[in-house]
A protein has these predicted regions:
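Terminal targeting/low-complexity segments that flank the catalytic cores of oxidoreductases
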Residues: 1-102, 106-115, 137-145, 149, ...
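Alpha-helical transition-metal enzyme core signature, strongest for iron centers
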Residues: 90-94, 98, 121-136, 167-178, ...
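Residues at alpha-helix boundaries and short interhelical turns
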Residues: 108-112, 126, 140, 188-192, ...
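Active-site-proximal, substrate-binding regions of enzyme catalytic domains
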Residues: 118
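Soluble, non-transmembrane catalytic domains of enzymes that act on hydrophobic metabolites at membranes
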Residues: 189-199, 207-228, 269-272, 308
């Protein structure tokens, strides 16, 4: 590679790292730090009375007038249903992600470390999806599918997305939930099973985030200009979908609350706005650095409520 080539493979964060070296390190980490949730977690242990299923500060209605009128029992029940809804959302995201990864490696050498790591990540995501499904079933809560319009938008996105668009969406689906889960697994107020699920997910998702970030940096340097611009717009629209889908309104109905009133209070809540923006900040700072948050795309991100 000439000096001119090296200069091309730079962005605002510096020189891009070698794709194969990154994948080899991630493969080594996967070999040492991967988990089988079926054997790692105690699925038969009863839930502990009085413990939350999600930290109360992360429950959507926290610190709203409706929250202050709710009993502690109803608040905990809402945390259980919101945890189930987020697990359902996580399964939806991971099924999309697995298809995007398969598309990404379709034309690449199967013997490369980059492809082998993508296949390893798909293995991880299969386990995570099964783990989330088992958590939902264990709690006797319903599965909370996304709205049909979002289901269809996801189907369209995973079909037409550019490679940089795919990795931007991957990071959006992973990093906000990851931020919340990092607050959840050490929290002793939370049910041990939920803490165990989030611990496994955080450890394994850290590798997925590294892989996606490094590949997105490369793509935003090497992709055609039209692809970069298309990525900016589609990522902004996906952020809008994500922000809406993050709350499934049926959780309120299922715990005896007025759905419309609850959604209105969540939308007006400064605390909830701060939680979502804090959860997305590490990602939005990164996307800003690599020139994803530009033009129309940036305005869409801001309208999603994830960008201050």
């Amino acid at each position: 590679m000439t000096e001119a080539d090296i200069d091309v493979l730079r962005d605002a964060l510096g020189l891009l790292k070698d794709r194969e070296q990154i994948a080899e390190r991630l493969l080594a980490s996967s070999a040492k730090h991967s988990f089988d949730p079926d054997s790692e977690l105690d699925w038969d242990a009863p839930f502990e009375e009085g413990k939350w299923f999600w930290p109360p500060e992360l429950v959507s209605l926290y610190d709203t007038p409706m929250w202050r009128r709710m009993s502690e029992e109803q608040r905990i029940l809402l945390s259980q249903h919101e945890a189930a809804a987020l697990a359902s959302l996580g399964i939806w995201f991971e099924i999309i992600l697995m298809q995007l990864l398969v598309r990404h490696i379709y034309d690449k050498p199967a013997t490369s470390a980059h492809v082998r790591y993508a296949l390893t990540e798909i293995e991880d995501e299969c386990r995570h999806s099964k783990m989330f499904a088992r958590l939902i079933s264990r709690g006797d809560t319903p599965w909370y599918p996304v709205a049909r319009v979002h289901q269809n938008l996801g189907r369209l996105f995973k079909t037409i997305s550019t490679t940089p668009g795919s990795f931007t969406a991957t990071l959006l689906g992973e990093e906000v939930l990851d931020w919340m889960q990092r607050l959840t697994f050490p929290d002793e107020r939370v049910q041990p099973l939920v803490r165990g699920v989030t611990r496994i997910h955080v450890v394994e998702e850290a590798r997925h985030v590294r892989y996606a970030r490094e590949e997105l940096r490369r793509q935003m340097v090497t992709a055609p200009k039209w692809s970069q611009e298309f990525t900016r717009v589609t990522s902004g629209e996906f952020a809008r979908v994500f922000a809406i889908a993050f709350i499934n309104p049926e959780v309120y109905t299922n715990v005896g609350l007025d759905k419309r009133a609850a959604l209105a209070q969540v939308k007006a809540s400064p605390h909830r706005r701060e939680v979502m923006q804090n959860g997305a900040k590490r990602l939005t700072d990164f996307l800003d650095d690599i020139r994803v948050l530009r033009g129309v795309g940036r305005r869409l991100w801001r309208s999603s409520g994830l960008l201050a």
